[in-house]
Amino acid sequence: VATLDDLVKSDISQTSQIGLMVYDLDADSAIYCHNELQTMRPASTMKVITAIAALDKLGGSYQFKTDLCYTGEIKGHVLHGDIYCVGGFDPKFNVDDLNAFVEGVRRMGIDTIMGNIYADKSMKDTARLGEGWCWDDDNPCLSPLLIGRKDNFIDRFAQKLVDEGVVIIDKDSVNCAFRFMNTHGNFVRRKPQGTYSITSRFHTIEQVMMKMLKESDNLYAESMFYQLAASTGARPATAKNARAVINH
């Protein structure tokens, strides 16, 4: 108690707002209070609440998943159909994962795609900023399909396929669809029923939570928050869904 008294009476309190409550769970009572009723912005302390709820509701073996699927059929080395990149809001998806997606396509013997490449972003709502953030804050883009924290997945995937010798031809055109490189989100569509899996990439809840808590990473925290929302079965998942899980 003396140490806490020293803290609240220190010089830092002259230029800061301090509110403390130490609560004894066994005795079900507060054992130290200082400005405990003062309204303050919770800031990154809420990441701890999100982490606890995620471990409780999702479990320690939960994995963040990104899928690569296709429709149609493969004849020879030509895919007559579309490819769907299905986002699960994995903030750790990086170049290595993208290369694995390209390798998955090549491993199936595909060297030509007679169709389109779509981003399935239906896992969550279209809100690009987290609730409570101002438009001019330095915030991450909350897209469920990111690569290297950026919302340019389809552009980079299509470019990588072309770099590896895969020809992409718009099924409605005789021209190679190099326009994929600058679609800026135009090729967004929910995958239909009956798609076939090419490959999937995973990252564990532990991997995401480590950066979320140790580095107080807002993108990782928002991603964890939306995993809770998606666990309700809502599609698209919303912040309201996540709050309901945490408050339950």
Language model features: what each stretch is:
Residues 1-39, 101-109:
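Beta-lactamase-like hydrolase cores
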Residues 63-125, 133-140, 144-147:
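Active-site-adjacent, His/Asp/Glu-enriched structural segments that form or flank metal-binding
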Residues 28, 42-60, 117, 156-161, ...:
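Active-site SXXK
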Residues 151-248:
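A small/polar active-site loop signature that marks catalytic segments
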Residues 15-17, 35-37, 43-46, 61-63, ...:
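Extracytoplasmic
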Residues 56-71, 168-176:
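Short, well-structured active-site flanking segments
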Residues 33-42, 83-93, 102, 142-148, ...:
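Second-shell loop/turn segments in exported
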Residues 26-27, 38-41, 74-75, 89-93, ...:
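Solvent-exposed loop/turn segments at secondary-structure junctions
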